[in-house]
Design a protein with these regions (language model features):
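Inter-Walker segment of RecA-like/P-loop motor cores
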Residues: 127-166
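Loop/turn-to-beta-strand initiation segments
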Residues: 107-108, 146-151, 170-173, 196-202
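Post-DEXD/H (motif II) to motif III coupling segment of the RecA-like Helicase ATP-binding lobe
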Residues: 173, 178-215
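Conserved helix-turn-beta segment of the N-terminal RecA-like "Helicase ATP-binding" lobe
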Residues: 104-105, 109, 116-142
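Conserved pre-motif I regulatory segment
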Residues: 2-5, 21, 30-83
Length: 215
């Protein structure tokens, strides 16, 4: 499989692998230059979500998970294209909402799902976790509006990519459920239109399980 083109280009998600490979070859002077225009917003990790009269507090392990994701680096360079592997019951819904809230709701965000049952579950849960936020749910080809926090079925976006491509250009943070299947064609189609995003974080409970299975 050819990961690097004849021009020396590779997909940005492969940067950690390329960096580690160069290090294993004994290359020491590796310089990473990020020329993307990134808003100067310092993340503040919330300790609770929901309404003030009925707050839902994050557990210390959830707060630590968010810190780990938001402090991800390649070498000494911040690199917020990463994935976290968390067991079932860890609270992925809370993590997704907390990641959005960490940037004070200032980053247009899309949460990509591939399961309709989970979509309906999030449709019930997320508004309670993010009251007063501009939330939109996108399924099928009929979508009248996008919000600041968009929960979308990846199949719907992929099938209607021309209809939604302008909306995707506005997205700055991409959150992905079941990150272990991100390399399938449907996800890749959508992600190829999300090139203005500088944060891409996936969560899964099976990443390393699949690696062990394939090993």
């Amino acid at each position: 499989i050819k990961y690097i083109s004849s021009y020396g280009e590779f997909k940005i998600g492969l940067l950690p692998m390329v960096y580690n490979t160069l290090k294993s070859w004994g290359v020491e002077d590796i310089k990473i230059t990020d020329k993307r225009i990134i808003p100067n917003i310092e993340p503040i990790i919330p300790t609770q979500l929901g309404a003030n009269y009925n707050p839902i507090k994050l557990y210390p392990r959830q707060i630590q998970a968010i810190k780990t994701l938001l402090n991800n680096k390649v070498g000494d360079t911040p690199f917020l294209i990463c994935a976290g592997d968390y067991s079932v019951g860890f609270g992925k819904t809370l993590l997704f909402c907390a990641l959005y809230k960490a940037y004070q709701g200032n980053l247009p965000t899309i949460l990509l799902l591939n399961d309709s049952d989970l979509f309906n579950q999030f449709k019930r849960e997320i508004p309670e976790l993010l009251p007063n936020e501009d939330i939109a749910f996108i399924q099928g080809s009929k979508c009248n509006r996008w919000g600041k926090f968009n929960v979308a079925m990846v199949q719907s976006i992929s099938k209607n990519i021309r209809q939604y491509q302008q909306n995707l250009l506005d997205i700055r943070m991409v959150l992905i459920d079941e990150a272990d299947i991100i390399d399938n064609k449907t996800y890749q189609t959508v992600i190829s239109y999300l090139y203005n995003s500088f944060i891409r974080i996936g969560l899964s409970g099976t990443i390393y399980m699949n690696e062990r299975k394939n090993g």
